[in-house]
Amino acid sequence: MDHKEIILLFLLFLKPGQGDSLDGYVSTQGASLHSLTKKQLAAGSIADCLAKCEGETDFICRSFQYHSKEQQCVIMAENSKTSSIIRMRDVILFEKRVYLSECKTGIGKGYRGTMSKTKTGVTCQKWSDTSPHVPKYSPSTHPSEGLEENYCRNPDNDEQGPWCYTTDPDQRYEYCNIPECEEECMYCSGEKYEGKISKTMSGLDCQSWDSQSPHAHGYIPAKFPSKNLKMNYCRNPDGEPRPWCFTTDPNKRWEYCDIPRCTTPPPPPGPTYQCLKGRGENYRGTVSVTASGKTCQRWSEQTPHRHNRTPENFPCKNLEENYCRNPDGETAPWCYTTDSQLRWEYCEIPSCGSSVSPDQSDSSVLPEQTPVVQECYQGNGKSYRGTSSTTNTGKKCQSWVSMTPHSHSKTPANFPDAGLEMNYCRNPDNDQRGPWCFTTDPSVRWEYCNLKRCSETGGGVAESAIVPQVPSAPGTSETDCMYGNGKEYRGKTAVTAAGTPCQEWAAQEPHSHRIFTPQTNPRAGLEKNYCRNPDGDVNGPWCYTMNPRKLYDYCNIPLCASLSSFECGKPQVEPKKCPGRVVGGCVANPHSWPWQISLRTRFSGQHFCGGTLISPEWVLTAAHCLEKSSRPEFYKVILGAHEERILGSDVQQIAVTKLVLEPNDADIALLKLSRPATITDNVIPACLPSPNYVVADRTLCYITGWGETKGTPGAGRLKEAQLPVIENKVCNRAEYLNNRVKSTELCAGHLAGGIDSCQGDSGGPLVCFEKDKYILQGVTSWGLGCARPNKPGVYVRVSRYVNWIEREMRND
């Protein structure tokens, strides 16, 4: 369930004025606690459940979980720090923030963490014990002060903060070393700052992170759930020396914020390594030469290269001497070099030797691996071994070996026969609903995957990531199918997927319920006992069942066939999606990028630019590709080709009848074809983005082309390469493209170099995968050379011109 649906649930189940009360809780969709001390109560809303937790007197309520369909609330003494979490359907877990926090605000009067040692390392005495010290403060004398176990507390408002009685007979009490919460101050470089400062150093108001005005940007809160990009508060999502924000001044894109450093010692760092693990952010070895053998510049020096990656700006990153480090979240340790001609370079650090590759343990660098050519699973999907890694709401799956953001026991070691590779959808616990995965969204523990049973996609086809499978029309009446999650489904199916008859929505037997009735939801189509989806459940239509021991279950409603003759952005041959570092890319699977065209001169037939089919009659390319001639008859377009020179009989060659240049001199142009292209498995348009859509930073996208390959294998055949999008704020740094990239452009590439678009790729597509299709986000435009380190390629941002594109096509 995505964030919008969670918000809708809150609105549905909260009473007026109760929303703010939940600010003190952390919510996790799909998580249930194993609790020993709990109460199970009837509750008609989240607000009811919240009130029961806040008013509990038999024990301290640290969490509650709400089951909407059961109208049930479970309030608990435990939380995820003290108890194990299991995945569960249709439940939201709410945990009180104060009991999850291990930091203090102010003097720590409200601290409720679990620190139980003093500054000098002495174990604390239990507050309820009378030996070795008879306490003045105890649970019985001060019941509201949280005097549990032997945890550090501040029941007397001591100005020096939390303390405890000690187990040392000679030391009655001592203070504890509790770090400050990063709300009024910051540790390190403010990566975990969660305060509410929303003005820059010069006093400018910050722009809200979920706004794209006045500055469009790629730090989209929904794409970076772990970065806490709330409201317009200063944050540090990209490894800067301190928190910053985009400003509301159109003439000032961004600026640092003035956040003071905390005066107490920072929290203890995690484990450090003398070898490479993950991205190497915790590498503390002494390698001091780059991959090409250049000596590293000392981090504290400013010659030959001036920079702000200094020990003062990054006090927690151990920037000692000239050792290779990764202070800012790069893909590997690096350093500035002592060569004035090479600003910086990655280092070669020996791997720690784990059998698990770094990429597998780091969900942030895992590629998107959801097939567009639809895979399916047999039965309940326990045997599914495909490469889908996206949930049914479009969330990215967490790697099975990773414990971030969700800790779990479904690991390859615990389930060796379950095929738990990378972050691919699997079914290790034999879930009857099919393959699932943990998500990379901290607020959504897990979801089912964006897959269908083979019986719903044509049936009987073996599961494979390679074999194309084209969905067939469902064998039911035209109206008895659903679009999306089936919220608008009004068919007459009245049995669950397991074959159990549905209970009528107006009935209260065998199951009594108050929320989902024809009276409470008059627009939800709750007629008779038909399957419906009144709460927008991502798993589709459901019903209360006639089985007294089964409250509800889901129905098996097929998806409706597409209304259009083709679907943009969906190739019929699965792309290779090679993650290699088209200089340095790999040869594409033939016809796996069916919108790619070759722009040629009509008479010589020589390829000189790429382009993208966006409708049967229109191609999008770069304006600079049309400098050879202003006459449309000079050009022709080749569609459905894989080889640049050897054109098969199924390749389409179509003349151009009109050239339309963008009126404000942007490097983008439309070509109208002399006749509509024939849509085949080899020729399919790409999808256009929504107007002004901004691709999130680090999104993995793909470029294709027949351009210059600099001697790498595959020349003459269509090549592909995977590139991460780089936020313009980063791309415009002095060491990269030095403010050359406009807001109407985007850049993408590997800063280490080695892979890029090149001459002959101009005008071609940069497409990004979104849930189930490829969207054309960029037109290959320019770069400083090909595949040079620190010089990513630049692409026209298509979303800024969608209104112009659609207007020209419509008015022609």
UniProtKB/Swiss-Prot annotation:
Pfam families (alphabetical): Kringle, PAN_1, Trypsin
Gene3D superfamilies named in the record: Hepatocyte Growth Factor, Plasminogen Kringle 4, Trypsin-like serine proteases
Post-translational modification, as annotated: In the presence of the inhibitor, the activation involves only cleavage after Arg-581, yielding two chains held together by two disulfide bonds. In the absence of the inhibitor, the activation involves additionally the removal of the activation peptide.
UniProt keyword terms in alphabetical order: Blood coagulation, Cleavage on pair of basic residues, Disulfide bond, Fibrinolysis, Hemostasis, Hydrolase, Kringle, Phosphoprotein, Protease, Repeat, Secreted, Serine protease, Signal, Tissue remodeling, Zymogen
Positions of the Peptidase S1 domain: 582-810
Class in the EC hierarchy, top level: hydrolase
Active site per database record: H624 (charge relay system), D667 (charge relay system), S762 (charge relay system)
A single MF term (Gene Ontology): protein domain specific binding
Modified positions (Phosphoserine) in chain numbering: S598, S690
E.C. no: 3.4.21.7
GO cellular component: cell surface; external side of plasma membrane; extracellular space; glutamatergic synapse; Schaffer collateral - CA1 synapse
All residue ranges annotated as the PAN domain in the record: 20-98
Membrane-traversing stretches: none
Main location per the UniProt record: secreted
Residues in Kringle domain copies: 102-181, 184-262, 274-352, 375-454, 480-560
GO biological process: one example: negative regulation of fibrinolysis
Note: Plasmin is inactivated by alpha-2-antiplasmin immediately after dissociation from the clot. In the presence of the inhibitor, the activation involves only cleavage after Arg-581, resulting in 2 chains held together by 2 disulfide bonds. Without the inhibitor, the activation also involves removal of the activation peptide.
Subunit structure: Interacts (both mature PLG and the angiostatin peptide) with AMOT and CSPG4. Interacts (via the Kringle domains) with HRG; the interaction tethers PLG to the cell surface and enhances its activation. Interacts (via Kringle 4 domain) with ADA; the interaction stimulates PLG activation when in complex with DPP4. Angiostatin: Interacts with ATP5F1A; the interaction inhibits most of the angiogenic effects of angiostatin.
Protein name in UniProt: Plasminogen
